[in-house]
Amino acid sequence: MFTLKKSLLLLFFLGTINLSLCEEERNAEEERRDNPDERDVEVEKRFLGGLIKIVPAMICAVTKKC
């Protein structure tokens, strides 16, 4: 029973370290992405994507030829 507890404790410890390293890596990626130019490009892509979906519906509504 003691060896089982010991191995479970070891697995928990290693898992905690792994999650900690992943979180640090994710934070580093977010810091690199905080460049204002990149954020503007992302916003522009989202805006144009939504606009492309809406334009055909607006044309149909205005011309009433769908």
Curated annotation (Swiss-Prot):
InterPro entries: Antimicrobial_frog_1 (IPR012520), Frog_antimicrobial_propeptide (IPR004275)
Subcellular localization(s) per the UniProt record: Secreted
GO cellular component term of the entry, any: extracellular region
UniProt propeptide residues: 21-44
A Pfam family matched in the record: FSAP_sig_propep
Taxonomic superkingdom: Eukaryota
The keyword Signal is assigned to this record: yes
Primary location recorded for the protein, binned into one broad class: secreted
Keyword presence, Flavoprotein: no
GO term, biological process aspect, one: defense response to Gram-negative bacterium
Tissue-specificity statement: Expressed by the skin dorsal glands.
Keyword terms: Amphibian defense peptide, Antibiotic, Antimicrobial, Cleavage on pair of basic residues, Cytolysis, Disulfide bond, Hemolysis, Secreted, Signal
Annotated disulfide bonds: C60-C66
Signal peptide from the UniProt entry: 1-20
The protein's role, per its UniProt record: Potent microbicidal activity, active against S.aureus and E.coli. It also acts as a membrane-disruptive agent at higher concentrations.
Family membership: Belongs to the frog skin active peptide (FSAP) family. Brevinin subfamily.
Protein's UniProt name: Ranalexin
Source species of the chain: Aquarana catesbeiana (American bullfrog)
